[in-house]
Amino acid sequence: MEKDAEFAKDWPTLVRAIESGIESHDGREAQLLAYMLSHNPTHPLDVLSTIDEFSLREDFLISVGPNKADILRDLIMREKPRMLVELGGYLGYSAVLFADAMVKAHGGDEGLKIYSLELDPICAAIARQIAQIAGLAHIIEVVEGTAASSITNLVKENKITSVDFLFLDHVEDLYEQDFKVVEALSVLKKGAVVVADNVIRPGAPEYREFIRGDMKKEQGWESRGVKGLIWPGNFEDELEVSKLVGLEVNN
C-alpha cells in the first residue's frame, strides 16, 4: 500500500490514465497545445521539456518521453540521416526531437527532411503547430492518413526516393505489415536504420520475430533490442534497432 501511494505521488497522471483506461484522444491533445502556447517555449529542447512537463503534471501523453529521447538522439547523431520517416507522429514530440538532432548532426539544415505520418487529423494539426513553435516546420512535414497509403503516395510523387531512418511508433500490430510496405517500395538502401518503439510494452512480438528472422538476416539486416523507459512511470521497455548492413532490399 505504501508503494502504491508513493507511485501515485510520483506519477499522478499515469495513475489517472490507468484508472480510467484512457490515455489519448480525449481532448488532452488540445489541452497540450493551449499549455504550450501559454508557456511560449522558444527552442526545440524547451518544446520537448514543455510536453514532458504537461505529461507529468497535467495529463499523461503517449509521447516517447525523455529517457527514450536520449537514446533516439544518440542514434541520430551516430547515423546522421537526411531523410527520416516516422509512422505515427502523434503530437510531434519525436519529429521535433529528430529534426533538432539532425540539424546538430549535420551542422545545419540543408537537405534535411522528416515526413511524420499521422492518421488522426486533430493530432496532425497540433503536430504542425508544435513543429512551427519549435522553429522546425521547414524540415518537418506532417502527412495525414494511414501510414501505408501516405508513404506509398510520397514515393509515387517522388518526394521520397530513399529512407535513411524509419521510426515505427503507431500501432504495434501494424509494424510488420507497414515495414513490408516500405520495403516493397525499394526505399530502404544499405545503411538504412529502422527503429520500432514499444516492442515490450505494449509489445510487438510478431514484428520482433520477423525482423530478427533468418530471412531478414540473409537480406543483410542486423537487429537488437535497446532498453528504454516508458515515461511517466519508468516502466522498462525496449526499442528494436535494425540496420541494413548487407544487401539492398529488392535490388
Model-derived segments and spans:
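Short, well-ordered secondary-structure micro-motifs
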Residues: I22, L97, I126-Q129, T152-V155, ...
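C-terminal substrate-binding/active-site "lid" region of AdoMet-derived donor-dependent transferases
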Residues: L174-N251
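Active-site segment flanking the S-adenosylmethionine/decSAM binding pocket
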Residues: E2-W11, G89, I140-P202
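Short alpha-helical
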Residues: T42, D46, Y93, P121-I122, ...
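N-terminal auxiliary segments of SAM/dcSAM-dependent transferases
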Residues: M1-V47, E58
